[in-house]
A protein has these predicted regions:
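Peripheral, non-AAA+ core regions of ATP-driven protein-machinery
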Residues: 1-72, 76-79, 184
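Active-site phosphate-binding and catalytic loops of NTP-dependent enzymes
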Residues: 30-33, 73, 96, 110-115, ...
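Conserved alpha-helical scaffold flanking the Walker A/P-loop in AAA+ ATPase domains
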Residues: 62, 117-123, 134-156, 189
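Walker A/P-loop
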Residues: 72-113, 178
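The Walker A (P-loop) glycine that initiates the GxxxxGKT/S ATP-binding motif of P-loop NTPases
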Residues: 75, 138, 160
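Conserved inter-motif catalytic segment of the P-loop NTP-binding fold
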Residues: 99-132, 139-140, 288-303
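Basic, amphipathic alpha-helical bundle interface domains used for macromolecular binding and assembly
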Residues: 143, 166-304
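Walker B catalytic acidic pair
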Residues: 153, 159-161, 171
């Protein structure tokens, strides 16, 4: 793991003779280097190029990644909501050195760190809707970090959001606002970091096909109204982008569009957007549109 630590040159030695050689003739000792950008090797397994017929959804992901915005996607089953969400880390900037250390410490405290491992890629966490409150926000006998802290500096994907108990979703209010979560345990309280991009996904109704042009919805108006009120207003107020994700057509599924944006294309747009924000907010305590206070919008942004 030492070769990942900045300002330290690490050498490997199989025998004591290798160590003696290093001490006597260090210039002759070969240093093995490791490609620091290990994100690409991991993220290349999934790519936005695989997502067909969802250019609007991809555009929303670019905006979310560039401005650090929370997103809610609404669409029927099979429309591609999960594919859009799970590829978001592929277009986020690499973790800085400080972020790598912080993320590694979090996973170490949670007991999820493998031996001699330094986490170098953005976390992606996708808890199931049956997850307990303690597993989401943290807690238990040892006050371990929960999913929202394990997603720190990465992505928290809440799939089938209306299926989560309302009190579990409402527990996201504090971290979405302050990027921290306080876990109370007996006589002590613990503050854990929870700075992530939150992606909520939901069907438009219990059966999943309200408004779908290809399949008729069978939900009653009462069921529909009850379903649409499962997510509280304070949570929705903290979501920046809302998009409707329609099921791609049969032709979209068959034809691989050469003009469809790949993760590499989208990452370039994200990097350009983040650079523009750094220049715009160079003298401000915040550095992204997602952190922009309401009172500063008219002053710092041209919205005419």
């Amino acid at each position: 793991m030492l070769h990942n630590i900045e300002a330290i040159t690490s050498y490997g030695a199989h025998t004591l003779a290798d160590i003696v050689k290093l001490v006597i003739r260090p210039d002759e000792y070969r240093v093995d280097t490791v490609d620091d950008d290990c994100n690409d090797a991991v993220n290349s397994l999934i790519d936005y190029k695989d997502v067909q017929g969802q250019e609007l959804g991809k555009r929303a992901m670019v905006i979310a990644a560039a401005g650090v915005h929370h997103v809610m996607m609404i669409g029927p089953p099979g429309s591609g909501k999960t594919m859009l969400a799970e590829r978001l880390p592929t277009i986020l900037p690499p973790l800085s050195w400080e972020e790598r250390l912080e993320t590694t410490r979090i996973h170490d405290v949670a007991g999820l760190l493998e031996k001699n491992t330094l986490i170098a890629k953005r976390p992606f966490r996708c808890p199931h809707h049956t997850a307990t409150l303690a597993s989401i926000i943290g807690g238990g006998s040892n006050a371990k970090p929960g999913e929202i802290t394990l997603a720190h500096k990465g992505v928290l994907f809440i799939d089938e959001a209306p299926e989560f108990p309302r009190y579990v979703l409402d527990a996201l209010r504090q971290p979405l606002e302050s990027h921290m979560i306080t876990v109370n345990r007996l006589q002590n309280s613990y503050d854990y970091p929870a700075d992530f991009i939150c992606i909520l996904a939901a069907n438009p109704c219990p059966c999943g096909y309200y408004g779908d042009p290809h399949k008729e919805c069978v939900c009653s108006s009462t069921e529909l109204e009850r379903y649409q009120h499962k997510i509280s207003g304070p949570i929705l107020d903290r979501i920046d982008l809302f998009i409707l994700v329609e099921r791609p057509s049969f032709n979209d599924m068959l034809c691989m569009d050469s003009d469809s944006m790949s993760s590499a294309d989208m990452k370039q747009l994200v990097e350009k957007g983040r650079q523009m924000q750094l220049e715009r907010f160079h003298d401000q305590p915040f550095k992204s549109n997602g952190a922009l206070p309401h009172g500063a919008i008219r002053e710092l942004c041209n919205i005419r």
